[in-house]
Amino acid sequence: MSQSLFNLKSLSRSINNTIRMRRYIVITKASQRAYTIGSSQEKPSWASDPDTGYFRPETAAKELDPYIAKTSQVQGKMMRGEELWWMPDPQTGYYRPDNFARELDAVELRSLHFNKNQKTYVVS
């Protein structure tokens, strides 16, 4: 009885090993095939963009018209908030960004807060 169990175990191990080896062979061949296909494809050459200084594929650099690139660059800056309009400050006369928020010191903040919360009484 024990001999038949031993034979059954060895048979099952050999079947498992065969299946594992076949999986391993299939996987390695597939990965080798993908590697050779991937390495045979043409690699893009990279060119630096004169406006931004970033490297991009040469085909994309050739296709972009300089006007379109400049326009999209300005639009990107405006979306990020980097494009600023400068206007003269009415109090100081110096130029500052249009979206500049005037800084308030602690005394001004305190007075604004207390004036809002105080009740006014009408004396008649």
From Swiss-Prot:
Record has Signal as a keyword: no
Sorted UniProt keywords: Mitochondrion, Transit peptide
Record field: transmembrane: none
Main location as per UniProt: mitochondrion
Transit peptide: 1-35
Keyword Mitochondrion: yes
Entries under Pfam families matching the protein: LEA_3a (PF03242)
Subcellular location: Mitochondrion
GO terms for cellular component: mitochondrion
Superkingdom, natural source: Eukaryota
Family in the record: Belongs to the LEA type 3 family.
Protein name: Late embryogenesis abundant protein 37
Biological source species: Arabidopsis thaliana (Mouse-ear cress)
Gene designation per UniProt: LEA37
